Amino acid sequence: MDARTLHEMKMTAYHRAVLRRMCSNPDLKRRVVQHLEDLMHRQPDMAPVWEAWCALLDRPEAEAVADLQADSVEGKRLRMVSPVTAVLYPAERAMVWRCVGWLIFLHHYLAAAADLGLDLEEQAAILGLDGAEIGTWSHAPPERMAEERLHGLRQVITVRHILTILKPVLSERRQWLETVNPDWEASPLALLCRGEGAVVCDHLARQVGPRLRAADLPRC
């Protein structure tokens, strides 16, 4: 992922987290509105942006998030010129950035699940969650998740990451998941679905070790 894409993702996740926080914290919304009124007087040349933000705050959360995520001039302007950060208390800012980290992690999971062709039933088996709930994550992500549920998400991300190195062709990755391994008498996907994803991840780690390049390793 290039730096520009990551920055856009962070900004979108940041404002999504703030909008969600405002829904549960009327005082935060009041401070943002008050700050917008002040900006209207101090920076009248930016009035169209401040007016767009005022309109955004009056919309339902899902619609407001859609506007912020829009790949358009208006959407990018809303993300880049934001009245929110200035009114956040330090504890609120820390909470929002924790939420940003979670949303980006969830984005990586959803991208990995899509890349591996995992349907909702398979994801439900891997994560131990309801498939219908998982199906809402792209537009209504959960605020948090129990630690024991995170193992499945990490395993899916790990499997996808290593397979992109071992098998650059998309169709080959899904084929590998579905092919029975004689040593396991089951396919990697079957192991993932019955809670034995650690076996799959360890196997892939041994396979990829000799092929790792400097660019594949984490940076300090």
Language-model segments: what does each one mean?
Residues 2-20, 24-30, 34, 41-45, ...:
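Non-transmembrane "mature" sequence context
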Residues 50-56:
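Short secondary-structure junction/hinge motifs that connect adjacent elements
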Residues 56, 66, 80, 87:
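Heme-based O2/NO sensor domains and their adjacent alpha-helical segments
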Residues 67-68, 72:
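Short helix-coil boundary/hinge micro-motifs
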